Each structure stands twice: as C-alpha cells, then as structure tokens.
C-alpha cells in the first residue's frame, strides 16, 4: 500500500478541515495516510486515528503570534523530519513553508515524492512588521520549494501570481470547498452574523463588532489566532458578541446554518488576503447563506459573479453598517442570495468535485492510471 505522510505545523480542533478532506480522500482511495501535526495547545492525544488518517502530534506548547513561536520552529522541524523519515513514506505532503525543510530532508533520505500544498504564501501572509530582507528571504525559500516539489497544490490557480516567477514541475488547483453536508438546524431567533476563522487584526472583526452593536445584530465569533490579546477584550465584553473559542468543525457548520449572514472580511492591503479562498465562504454557499465580504479580493469577485452576498470596502464602518442594515431589512433578498450561492455550490464548488482531481494528480505523480476528472468552475 502506498504510504502518504502529511506535515502541518498546526492542529486546530485536532485536525483542520482542508487537511482532513485531502487526507481523508486519499485514505478512502486506498492510500496508507499519516499526518504529523504540531499541537501547540497540548489539547489532543499524541496518537489518534480519524477517518482512516493516522495522526501523530508533536505536543509542544507555543503561543500564537509571539516570538516564542518562531523560536520553537526548529524543534518542530526536527521532530517532523525524524518522524517522517521513520515512517518511510512513498509521498511526503508538506503544507506551507514551515514544514519545507523537514519535508525536503525526509524526502531525500527516503526517496519519497514531494508534494507542496500552498494553503498560504508565507511571505505575503505575515502581517507583523518584519524587515523587508526577512520577507524576501521567506519568498525566496518558498520559490525554491515550489520549484523542487514534484507536485504543487493551490486552492486557486491565481495564486501563481505570488510565485514571483517560480515554475512548478506540476501544479493542480484543489479548491477549498466543503463536502456537501449542510446541517439541519433551526435559524437563530435574532439576526445573527457568524464569523469562524483566524482571530487576527486583518479580518475586520472590530468593524463587524461596531456594525452589530449599531444595528442590533448578534455577532458570534469562533476561532483562534495571533491577535487574541488585542481583540478578545473587545469581543468578550460587548453585549452584541458571543466568543466561542476553537470549536469542532461540525459545530462550525451548525453555527453557519443557524446564522443569517456569514462574515468573510479580509484586508486587501495584506497581499495574501487578495487571493484568500476561505472555506467559510463555500460553507455559506452550501448552507444557502449570504456572504458579507470586502472589496479587492478574489472572494469579492466570486460573490459578485454569483450574486451570493454583499461586498463592502474594507475598513469602511459606515458602508459595513449600511450593508448589514440592508440585509436585516430584506430577508427575501437574503434568501435569494443564499439560493444563488447554493446553486453555484451544487454546480461544482463542493469537495465531491475535488476528490477525483486530487486522486488523479496523485495517480499521475506515482505513475498509476487515473480517470480524468470533470473540471469544476474556477474561482471568480
């Protein structure tokens, strides 16, 4: 049996949705799948099996968004290298740059094929004020990884604009879309805005909070992230907001289905945000919910083209408040937006359309025959 080892330096809710979908697809496709994860909160068992995925966790505490996290990265890389090499995989599936050194070294030791999965382009993702030379070195390191990998996976082919001239040997677009399983839950009694994702300053959370306080909407927030210390005091003390922390993926879907609108604001001044393809937007489409997003992003293009939500300028609180008021005062319009999103989801923005594509890419990588997969629509 062909063995695949995933490397990921995070372990939110035990295993994050995109990784779980990719690894689960390969496990159901007959691969022996392992995932080496970094449990930064020491909240999950060292070893676990989920949906056919054998999970191995490095349980080293590391605070989000601090220098202490960067200092612990070498220890994580060394653990990932040793564990991956011992598993003797046929394929090493590395996610993002903070697994690159370990993945490349383990691939050289074992002779494994190397897959590089770009969830986020590292140099463009960092919002901290780092020296330009450091950012450039990160970009150069990612370019080398992209060119040396046997296969590169991106959630949107337009992310190639971030490659800065790097040319992958093979590349495939695997969109960040959910499996079709909308929960059957009752709508919240009060008009509710739900945000599930990173607790970060570039996600417009304080603007959303102000808009909800002004309009009387309820704001439910779930997730974790680097800016919790700065943002949680505002969120947790507002009567308009309920902060849930990190919750299981099934509860994320339930909150999505119960809400009236799903928030997905991204500051387009952060280069990585312009190409964001967040799971939450496609979960909203699956659950027939309108999306509230910000201009200057790939997601804004998608929402406009489908007509499944409202686009506002990022940071414009007055425009955000007016947009939210419009949604609250027009439930019929919300329903029409949700229906258009659901129709687009069914047409190809769902994981069932990605499974054959992922299995086909792996089959081609390993030289095994694979049926051609139908091409789902591109984002935007």
Residue ranges and their predicted role:
Residues 5-7, 153, 184-216, 220:
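Conserved donor-binding/catalytic core segment of Leloir-type glycosyltransferases
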Residues 8-13, 25-72, 159-173, 225-226:
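N-terminal strand-loop element at the rim of the active site
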Residues 24, 78-85, 101, 105-109, ...:
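Membrane-proximal helix-turn-helix segments that form the acceptor-binding/catalytic region
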Residues 123, 139-183, 243-244:
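Donor nucleotide-sugar binding/catalytic pocket of nucleotide-sugar-dependent glycosyltransferases
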Residues 229-256, 261:
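Nucleotide-activated donor-binding/catalytic signature segment of Leloir-type glycosyltransferases, i.e.
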Residues 261-264, 283-293:
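Short hydrophobic beta-strand element within catalytic cores of glycosyltransferases
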Residues 305-306, 310-318, 326-332:
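Conserved acidic donor-binding segment of nucleotide-sugar-dependent glycosyltransferases
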Residues 326, 333-348:
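A short, well-ordered alpha-helix in the C-terminal region of glycosyltransferases
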């Amino acid at each position: 049996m062909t063995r695949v080892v995933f490397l990921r330096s995070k372990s939110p809710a035990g295993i994050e949705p995109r990784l779980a979908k990719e690894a689960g697809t390969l496990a159901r496709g007959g691969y022996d799948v392992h995932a080496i994860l970094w449990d930064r909160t020491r909240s999950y068992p060292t070893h676990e099996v989920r949906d056919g995925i054998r999970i191995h966790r490095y349980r080293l505490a590391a605070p989000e968004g601090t220098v202490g996290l960067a200092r612990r990265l070498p220890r994580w890389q060394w653990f990932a290298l040793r564990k991956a090499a011992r598993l003797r995989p046929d394929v090493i599936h590395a996610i993002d740059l903070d697994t690159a050194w370990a993945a490349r070294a383990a691939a050289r030791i074992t002779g494994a094929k190397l897959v590089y999965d770009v969830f986020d382009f590292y140099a463009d993702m960092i919002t901290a004020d780092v020296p330009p030379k450091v950012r450039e070195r990160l970009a150069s390191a990612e370019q080398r990884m992209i060119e040396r990998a046997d296969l590169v996976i991106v959630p949107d082919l337009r992310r190639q604009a971030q490659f800065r001239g790097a040319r992958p040997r093979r590349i495939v677009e695997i969109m960040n879309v959910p499996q079709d399983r909308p929960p059957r839950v009752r709508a919240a009694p009060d008009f509710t805005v739900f945000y599930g994702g990173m607790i970060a300053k570039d996600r417009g959370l304080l603007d959303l909070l102000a808009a909800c306080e002004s309009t009387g909407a309820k704001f439910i927030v779930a997730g974790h992230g680097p800016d919790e210390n700065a943002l949680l005091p505002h969120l947790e003390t507002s009567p308009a907001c309920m902060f849930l922390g990190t919750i299981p993926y099934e509860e994320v879907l339930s909150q999505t289905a119960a809400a009236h609108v799903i928030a997905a604001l991204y500051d387009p001044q952060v280069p990585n945000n312009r190409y964001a393809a967040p799971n939450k937007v496609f979960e909203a489409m699956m659950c027939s919910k309108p999306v509230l997003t910000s201009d200057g992003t790939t997601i804004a293009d998608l929402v406009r083209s489908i007509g499944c939500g409202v686009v506002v300028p990022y940071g414009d609180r007055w425009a955000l408040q007016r947009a939210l008021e419009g949604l609250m005062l027009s439930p019929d319009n919300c329903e029409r937006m949700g229906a258009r999103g659901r129709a687009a989801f069914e047409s190809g923005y769902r994981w069932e359309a990605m499974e054959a594509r992922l299995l086909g890419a792996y089959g081609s990588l390993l030289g095994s025959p694979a049926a051609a997969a139908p091409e789902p629509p591109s984002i935007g």
